[in-house]
Regions:
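Short solvent-exposed beta->alpha transition segments
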Residues: 58-116
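N-terminal secretory signal peptides that target proteins for export/translocation
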Residues: 1-10
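Exposed beta-sheet edge and beta->alpha loop/turn motif
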Residues: 104-163
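Bacterial N-terminal signal peptides
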Residues: 12-24
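Short, low-complexity N-terminal intrinsically disordered segments enriched in polar/charged residues
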Residues: 24-60
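Solvent-exposed, acidic/flexible segments
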Residues: 31-38, 50, 69-73, 89, ...
Length: 163
């Protein structure tokens, strides 16, 4: 039971950090369009997560990070290291449901993330690959011109959520 809980937390951490990677450089080239900033970094963030670039991903978490599980930035970094060591390969498949900006320096992302040990080409492969499916609600903050994850919550998802 403890191992299962730790594995679920690891999935959550990796996926959260993936989302952070998506938005981390958003301030550089498209300063006037935050939504375009978030969307333009999807491929870059996926690459960082799949290539296990832990240092890059860790830099994308706010020092003020906290979540409903009582985790802070240090706890997330520790879990991330464990997850990256435990999994030989990581492949992600994402669907953004919504990006909202309640304030100029705050963003809320609602997205679906599937994780598997093999590449996921489309929604039809999710069941065959037995991918772990999650829905994430992530709050981002722009700190000194860079987007960082401030809070993230997740729950299990169904294949239909990806359609």
């Amino acid at each position: 039971m403890a191992e299962r809980k730790r594995a679920l937390t690891c999935h959550w951490v990796l996926t959260t950090l993936f989302v952070v990677a998506l938005v981390s450089g958003a301030c550089s080239s498209d300063r006037d369009n935050p939504e375009k900033q978030v969307r333009s970094l999807l491929a870059q963030g996926e690459t960082a997560a799949e290539q296990k670039q832990a240092g890059t991903l860790r830099q994308m978490i706010s020092e003020k990070y906290s979540d409903s599980q009582g985790q802070d930035k240090k706890a997330i970094e520790s879990t991330l290291r464990y997850y990256l060591l435990r999994h030989q390969t990581i492949h992600l498949f994402t669907r953004i449901r919504e990006i909202a900006f309640p304030a100029p320096d705050l963003a809320h992302v609602d997205m679906m993330v599937a994780m598997a040990g093999q590449p996921i080409a489309n929604v039809g492969e999710l069941e065959r690959l037995q991918a772990d499916l999650h829905r994430f609600e992530i709050n981002l903050v722009r700190e000194q011109g860079e987007w960082k994850v401030l809070r993230a919550e997740w729950r299990r998802a169904e294949i239909g959520d990806f359609l």
